[in-house]
């Protein structure tokens, strides 16, 4: 029940590029982002940090590090331009920071797609209690 409440809060507070990210994940993996990756492993989801449990979890750790490099925009609030072409994501934002945010989201969606074979349903709703300290970016 608590998990459903958390997911509901996340859905209500969505704006900017988060919607773009969710759409990228859906197109690239065929999986609904919040349900399948919103609390996955030790690094997917808000305020989660820890040693990645598998390749899918590593995708989230890399995405967090990518976002940390952005200094002139807030990728969770500001939207950017992109399109899908021949199964690939093409970022087309003129603002350099937002274009980099798009590239970060493209990278994680592509990483999820490339690691579908390592996706572990047992990690889908990981609370982070058993996550060890992560290395810095």
UniProtKB/Swiss-Prot annotation:
The record marks 133 as: Cationic membrane-docking site (MDoS). InterPro entries: PLipase_A2 (IPR001211), PLipase_A2_Asp_AS (IPR033112), PLipase_A2_dom (IPR016090), PLipase_A2_dom_sf (IPR036444), PLipase_A2_His_AS (IPR033113). The keyword Cell inner membrane does not apply. One of its GO terms (molecular function) is heparin binding. It comes from Calloselasma rhodostoma (Malayan pit viper). Snake venom phospholipase A2 homolog that lacks enzymatic activity. Shows myotoxin activities and displays edema-inducing activities. A model of myotoxic mechanism has been proposed: an apo Lys49-PLA2 is activated by the entrance of a hydrophobic molecule (e.g. fatty acid) at the hydrophobic channel of the protein leading to a reorientation of a monomer. Pfam families: Phospholip_A2_1. Residues 121-133 are annotated as: Important for membrane-damaging activities in eukaryotes and bacteria. This is Basic phospholipase A2 homolog W6D49. Residues 1-16 form the signal peptide. Keywords: Disulfide bond, Heparin-binding, Lipid degradation, Lipid metabolism, Myotoxin, Secreted, Signal, Toxin. Expressed by the venom gland. Disulfide bonds join 42-131, 44-60, 59-111, 65-137, 66-104, 73-97, 91-102. It comes from the Eukaryota. The keyword Signal applies. It is found in: Secreted.
